[in-house]
């Protein structure tokens, strides 16, 4: 079993959950039973160094000298597609996560409906993010149009896409989107975007910015006398404040701004591990006990990655044959600690869909906390706070 993870570089904090899960589950991964036979399993971890070129080389090493039958990966707008493309080219099965499925397909030069032979993914869609955010917008009275703070890179291009970006979902719900203008990351200022926000009287803002860029935008909007009633932001804002930015006060500032985000996993999700029955709450507690760090959303998905890999090796016609493992993944339906992963009926081939709920960064006794404030897509997830618009 091969793993490509960002152990170093700017994405390293997001590799921590996968490294932790591999350590925690090591005793359960030493062997798999398949068809009455036991097979020893070796786990080989390679560092992507948070770089697409290094990630491709990591796959080549796993496929060649390590002889991996399966590769797992997560994290990185540029790095994850590099891993999956390299696996496709090398003819090695791959399971990945933490990337909207439309971005997963588009970043690889394909269209929805395309079938990859070797690579499988589980996540949510941009349409799911739009639906969760629209649910939150509709709970804010008299907020007007939605200002879209989107960058000039892959995220912004996809969010603007006329078929699978935000517009098809939000226009059907009668929301008016106002593009505030593309910007380059990291931004050095948002005066033009703030001007458009004022011009259109938008009381809501949605974004996929880094925490640092979003805080800068909010600061400059306030300096101009503007205070959006609600800001919704995906991407980096889904992670705890201690893991996302070298400026620890940024998340306190964004909690003051009442920034809302998406939630794909939390300690309150009603799921258990297929390996040992561990609940989401137990996994989050163990992570804090063992690392001293707060739980973070990728933790549950990292665990589900490993569950999926072990399942595929257990049910494949021949776990030592890559084609058999890929075929097993294609037919997988598995209840995991991240929910039911079903690759037989996804929105497009090779995809298993995860539902989203709405969250908001709020002040807590230990600093900013991510509260679940909307659960219409998954009522089994308990609410842990009320949506609080800025005043």
What role is predicted for each listed range?
Residues 2-23, 46-52, 155-156, 272, ...:
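Extracytoplasmic "Venus flytrap"
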Residues 13-20, 31-106, 187:
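Beta-alpha junction/loop-to-helix N-cap segments that form part of ligand/metal-binding clefts
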Residues 39, 296, 314-328:
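Short, charged, surface-exposed loops that flank catalytic or proteolytic processing sites
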Residues 47, 106-135, 182, 248-264:
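Short beta-strand elements at the ligand-binding edges of bilobed clamshell
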Residues 62-77, 95-97, 147-150, 200-211, ...:
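Periplasmic-binding protein-like
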Residues 117-225:
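Extracellular/periplasmic Venus flytrap/periplasmic-binding protein
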Residues 224-303, 384-390:
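Extracellular/periplasmic periplasmic-binding protein-like sensory domains
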Residues 333-391:
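Solvent-exposed, acidic/polar segments of extracytosolic/periplasmic ligand-binding ectodomains
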